[in-house]
Amino acid sequence: MALAALLGILHRGQVEIRTAQLPFTLGGQRFAAGSYVVVLRQPYAAFAKTLLEPQHYPDLRVSPGGPPTPPYDVTAHTLPLLMGVAAVPAPDSLRLPLSAPVEPPGATPGYPGFGEGQAPRIGLYRSYDASMDEGWTRWVFDTWKVPYQPLVDSVVRAGKLKEQFDAILLPDQEPRQLLDGLPKSYPAPYPGGLGSEGARALRQFVEDGGTLIALNQASRFVMDQLLLPVRNVLEGVPDDDFYAPGSIFRLDVDTAHAVAKGTPAHNIAWFENGPAFEVVDSTAVRVIARYPADPDKVLASGWVLHPERVAGRAALLEVHLGSGRVILFGFRPQYRGQSIATYPLLFNSLQLR
């Protein structure tokens, strides 16, 4: 599915895609006949090159010897990394017979375990203080045929959530917005957020055996409100001491964990204003993925200031609480419907029993 999606994006951008007609070797790797090839001698080569290669930013400074000039917006859009597809640059000297331009293959999105009669009962929290990430999550779920029910503040605050759901997902949203929601000047039922009553109901849901999943900044809300034995090492750190305005980081993954089933030991994470975790009580917490211990290996594409702040830190955790569990993501595994490489981490989390 990921390969078809990547090729489809290139094709919609009018990039010519060809296939190798014979097996070939490149960079010590053997590629079969039929492998897809994008030749950069074509009108839309720059578009293809921009999407296929990692982004490396120049070292721009405010003044000679001064602090770096941070980028304005997100800094990475390397589709092979985001989608988990191998893309290998070839030298100009490579010569091999190629097909005429081809159409990308078709593929139907779907993931095992979400079929009728086997899918968990999923509640997707929908704040009245609208979250863009919640919209992207709905789009991903609808596209990949993941069944879910929208979950609003009043339903959460009413409690007895385990009677209705097996898993509840909180998309990326600032803790203040989750807790307080919209101001009281709005008409009912829109004012207020989850509040302390909703936080208590979520904790009870987990203690009763449910799975609560929090993405990116929502993890900070869950850590604080459910009093989890986890600390965010980036809490209170100013932008001039750590900054990553939307970058692709490398992940080292514990593939023995059920959340990481079917994923590679080395994956990626879309990092944007997320937490990085330190475990306070290891008897209740299991690290599923962490950033590389070497600061120079944290960044895969984009820009980061002081990567040593997150080097070796946990990026994905399971916290046991009562009869259930909390899954904390320090990144966005379904980032804008692009990061197919980390979809399985989210989908597997929803299916934990």
Feature names for model-found ranges:
Residues 1-296, 300-353:
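Intrinsic-disorder/low-complexity accessory segments
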